[in-house]
Amino acid sequence: MSAIVGLCLLSEKVVLSRSLTDEVSKLYKLNRGNVKEPRKYATERMSTQSKPVALQVPVSTIILDYKDEDFIKQNPTYSAMDIIGSPSNTAPQTAFQSIMPSLSALFNTPFIQGAFRHRVISSMGPEISYLVMVIGPPSGFMDTPMYRTVNHLSILMSNADVDLIDIIAINSTMAKSTKLVFASTFQAMLVNDVYDRCMVLVGIFLSQALPFFRNYVNVQSKGSLPPAVAACLNTPIKELFSMGSGKREPLALEFRKDNEGQCLGIVLPKGHEGDTLSSRYPAVFINESEPFSDEERSELSKLKRTDPDAYEKLYSETISKHVSDGSYGNRVIISHKMSRLSNGGVKIIGRFKISDFNTVKKNLSSRPGEVDSAKEQWEALSGNGLVTDNNTSMLHDKILDTITSNKPGVVLRDGNKKSDNIVVCFKNGFPNKKHSLLQLTKNGISVVSLDELTDAGILVESTGPDRVRRSPKALANKLSSFKGRKVTLDVDNMSTEALIQKLSTL
């Protein structure tokens, strides 16, 4: 399901009590389970009865806006700015109107721009289920401001001393006392990730993002809104998201050149056929030096011969430069050394090497001059978290497993094969304990959810133990109206290879 969500994180000590709309309540239930019951004092006297007027939101967030797939389909010409910047947000209006302009003034840019800074828009076409915006303002909010409307009571509590109603005061506080690198953080994520990310935002996630905020603020202080970002903010949603086509197509628009989000990278020494990965999956991987200009390569070549330490320093700086200007896009950077990625501002999601160096030497048989440097890189990789295999192909499979787990929704399309995918939906859910989703994907079989299935796809029902899941009315209607191919298979007693072969022949 495609949807857009805005979340505002006030602080760890903030508690928001309010009546939740049905849509927002549903979103919280997806993330955290049922919301807590109202506090005893959160009641309002209605004639002779006391009626609860507030529910305790289970995390320190305010939902600014929530639009589901139906809304997007009904309003395909709406832009991201139209949706998240709309007055229909469910947060207290005063908080929204105070915080957002302050952030906009601090960054000299529309607040939503930051969401695209973290690879929300991708040129490689992964699924994007949710656009989540998280904002962390400075300390200094009033202790217990209250907002009352006809239908609900909202209570916002913190350890602060500035009244949220006083827009001038809060703007002044933010402008004077907020370090820009702490002012805001943005991230695209799937609905099931919202809970986990909210729990670590103030800690691990925020600390990892700080170097990129510094660069972002520096760039914003020197110029105006990049044209590509401005275009992205005002581009109709229908041009940014594929909606229920049953097949995830690459996005038509390219916005990566001005996108400065944190890149992901893996460490893979020489002789491990990293070029094979980047050429076979060009939309997923990119070699660390690919964006380097001829001038940069020439300067690095000179330093490599005269000053190795200066060479490595400049190498990391060059990577950092191209991370900032978006040259790597949304692809995973393959590097020979950990230091190049970490010093270049790239998040390392995996370290890999072939367990027997003799295999590496065989891979370098046509390049004997690189064996010594390859061995140095190979020996430098050790410790917990290192993934090894003596077979190059099997090691590459482990890399792909890591990529798909760190980048939800990524579609691994073999660049050497036809792009036509078989679209399959397993009625009772994908049997992941028995079969490998990665193997199906690598063989051109895209597994989609029931609400994404079109009549061009295949519906698979298992004859094994029924893994019944609750089917909302909309999905039940989808099943009854499905006119595509249906097949019954004993998936629990088939090997993954047999399942792939069967699906490929349908």
From Swiss-Prot:
A Pfam match: Phytoreo_S7
Keyword RNA-binding attributed: yes
Known function: Probable component of the transcriptional machinery present in the inner capsid. Displays dsRNA binding activity and may play an important role in the sorting of viral RNA and virion assembly. Together with the RNA-directed RNA polymerase P1 and capping enzyme P5, forms an transcriptional complex positioned near the channels situated at each of the five-fold vertices of the core.
Entry similarity comment: Belongs to the phytoreovirus protein P7 family.
GO molecular function: RNA binding
Domain of life where this protein originates: Viruses
Protein name per the record: Protein P7
Paired cysteines (S-S): none
InterPro entries xref list: Phytoreo_S7 (IPR009873)
Keywords: Host cytoplasm, RNA-binding, Virion
Source lineage: Viruses, Riboviria, Orthornavirae, Duplornaviricota, Resentoviricetes
A cellular component term, taken from the record's GO annotations: virion component
Naturally occurring in which organism (per UniProt): Rice dwarf virus (isolate Fujian)
Entry's localization field: Virion; Host cytoplasm
